[in-house]
């Protein structure tokens, strides 16, 4: 792709998650021109992650026959906790080796002062949906981002809710189980993320397998496959009882969280995106997952907000964060 043949300006978007990093080039209409996914490699520290990110940026620039001179600005999104005005991560549960890291200034300096903007990953994804995705006609939106953890972006009257201390929308850490709740990576017990985050889902699944629960997952793991949300999804598609139980429990908990936000915010739409949506709208399992969320919300929510709030999958899928 030659930049002379396309209308600029162009932007680099970087969506850093606890497992993967997504990097893309986007034009000012939100069209993705190139995309690359790489590993965060959290256990190896921030330098390893940055090396992968810089290489991914080089790759997408090459795909478009661009140089950094063709790029107007860089956008970076990470999971919380964070200091958005200060441009740094604070103490993110799913990026523990990035604690206190000044990501915005580091990337800006690496690219010779290129304008660099920093935002919470769920907020960025919510704005992507609001800008060019499934919430284009909405004035208020909640977007759940389901991945290694559970993020949440909130837009009310066209404004992203960042909060006074950059912690607005950390709804994955709402407490949904007061007694004997599961431990979350945040150090709290009974959070929504402890039940519906991908990392927690895998951990609880392993505990049940170790306790002797029957499942196809035993043979799948013994065959050399790594236990992951994807593997649990594959087992569920074969009607594995344990896998379906775990996914439906995750959906039930998300239904509880969705009800809470419905009563708190009363938004036009509540959408679900990210890598742990079990195939999303294109999958029968994904549709069962969504229907369980809706049913839990129907049972718990006031009638008027439930009947007038759209609950669906995000249109942009896992691309929303870097867009």
Language-model-detected regions and their locations in the chain:
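ATP-binding/phosphotransfer module of carbohydrate and carboxylate kinases, centering on a glycine-rich
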Residues: 1-73, 84-86, 107-115, 131-138, ...
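A charged helix-plus-loop insertion that forms the helical arch/lid used to bind
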Residues: 87-99
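Glycine-rich phosphate-binding loop of actin/hexokinase-like ATP-binding domains
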Residues: 136-196
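Short hydrophobic alpha-helix segments
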Residues: 36-38, 93, 164
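Hydrophobic "anchor" residues
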Residues: 31-32, 89, 160-161
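Short loop/edge segments at beta-strand edges and connector loops
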Residues: 118-120, 126
């Amino acid at each position: 792709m030659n930049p002379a043949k396309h209308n600029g300006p162009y932007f680099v978007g970087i969506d850093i998650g606890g497992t993967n990093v997504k990097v893309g080039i986007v034009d000012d209409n939100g069209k993705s021109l190139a995309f690359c996914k790489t590993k965060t490699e959290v256990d190896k520290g921030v330098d390893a992650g940055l090396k992968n990110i810089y290489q991914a940026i080089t790759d997408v620039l090459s795909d478009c026959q661009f140089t950094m001179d063709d790029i107007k600005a860089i956008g970076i999104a990470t999971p919380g906790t964070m200091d958005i005005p200060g441009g740094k991560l604070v103490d993110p549960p799913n990026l523990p080796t990035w604690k206190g890291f000044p990501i915005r200034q580091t990337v800006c300096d690496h690219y010779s002062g290129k304008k660099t903007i920093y935002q919470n990953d769920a907020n960025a994804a919510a704005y992507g949906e609001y800008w060019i995705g499934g919430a284009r006609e909405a004035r208020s939106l909640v977007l759940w981002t389901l991945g290694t953890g559970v993020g949440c972006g909130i837009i009310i009257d066209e404004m992203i809710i960042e909060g006074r201390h950059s912690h607005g929308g950390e709804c994955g850490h709402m407490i949904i189980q007061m007694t004997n709740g599961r431990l979350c990576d945040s150090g709290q017990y009974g959070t929504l993320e402890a039940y519906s985050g991908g990392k927690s889902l895998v951990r609880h699944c392993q505990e049940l397998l170790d306790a002797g629960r029957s499942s196809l997952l035993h043979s799948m793991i013994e065959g050399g496959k790594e236990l992951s949300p994807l593997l649990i999804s594959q087992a569920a598609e074969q009607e594995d009882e344990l896998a379906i139980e775990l996914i439906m429990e995750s959906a039930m908990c998300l239904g509880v969280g969705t009800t809470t936000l419905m009563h708190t915010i009363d938004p036009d739409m509540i959408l679900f995106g990210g890598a742990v949506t079990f195939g999303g709208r294109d999958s029968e399992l994904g549709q069962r997952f969504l229907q369980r969320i809706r049913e839990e919300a129907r049972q718990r929510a006031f009638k008027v907000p439930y009947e007038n709030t759209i609950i669906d999958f995000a249109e942009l899928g896992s691309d929303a964060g870097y867009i």
